[in-house]
Amino acid sequence: MDRLEHTMMFKSQGGDVSPQEILQQVYVALEEKGYDPINQLVGYLMSGDPVYITSHNQARSLIRKLERYELLEELVRSYLQEK
């Protein structure tokens, strides 16, 4: 069979910190530095450029522990569970 006929599945790497915890910690770090956390996170998720995330409290290195799709999965999951 042609490889293009199969759906590719993303698999989480699994780690010691959940995507939810990472997003919360990064959000707080951005707020503490006076940034708009939503705008900064959207900029990072859209571009992949870590410069959108402050290095304050190791937020930049923390958010890079996960792939952007894992962060998006968490955001979508959380949004849909609240509906």
UniProtKB/Swiss-Prot annotation:
Pfam families in the record: IreB
InterPro entries documented for this protein: IreB
Disulfide linkage: none
Source species, domain of life: Bacteria
Family to which this protein belongs: Belongs to the UPF0297 family.
Protein name: UPF0297 protein DSY2420
UniProt source species: Desulfitobacterium hafniense (strain Y51)
